[in-house]
Amino acid sequence: MQLQQIIYNFGTNFTLKKGMLGIRYERVDPEYKTLGAYYFNNDFENITLNAAFNLLKDKLSLQTNIGRQRDNLQNQKGKQTSRWVGTVNANFQASDKLMITASYSNFTMFTNNQLNQFNNINNNPLQIQQPRDSIQYRQISQNVNININYALSATKEKAQNININYSLNDMVNKEDGIVRRGGISRFHNANINYNISFPERKMNIAASINYTNTYAASQYTNIIGPSISFNKGILKDKMQISSGASYNISSGRGIRTSVFNFRAGASYAPWEKHNFDLNIINMFRLTNQNIPHPKMNEITCTVGYNYRF
């Protein structure tokens, strides 16, 4: 006798004085068929919890979400997968000038290839190094981001702000609790940006320094360098001119490379539907790598015309 395959999907939210709590449950039985979105997606169960709160006189807002998904609900498959997903977001308005945001997310996946029980019974217990036909696989991915923005000044004549940002991406792959060679990858990025604008002059200047550290395939790579840019509107804002320069040094695996870029461009719109563009990029590269051209100077020039119908 074949049991009827059904689907469940329900949830509720509880409103609090300074926040909210919610829960949702979703289940789709194996071999459930419909003409809707679940035709190709069945045999899974989702449980999700979420919450949001406003604290410190509404200066701090917190949002969090955690959920679990699993398949193989009736143990009919040779493999079972479960996933955990969690996120936390925070926004803190410390003052009229200072804003801090932070976020964290975690994705964890477990996969178990189930053993054939008859193989376990029939295996000779004296053969200690019996080949395994089951692997417990786990993948953990974590992301962190922190952003700090501070407004130095804000007037009609001049506006200044400084921004600091840091991000991390970390991924680990495990087999039977063991991290194999190359099973870890980690990415760090940090940058500081300074921006000053003169609204009445239609002019903006920005400067930044960026640092990146990457660990992948058991190797480290570092990249660091500053950049600066300039933008201004002229001819009653019909023309926009811009220029910029950047320099970075990368090192890793015994290779060191330095790159310098200079950019200049202009955009001119003499009439409402017509636009002309001119951009020039000059790149200098120097490396100690054993390649045919360790020193390179490249110039790229593009000219464009655009008509809007």
Language-model regions, residue ranges each:
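Exposed, low-structure sequence patches enriched in small/polar residues
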Residues: M1-F309
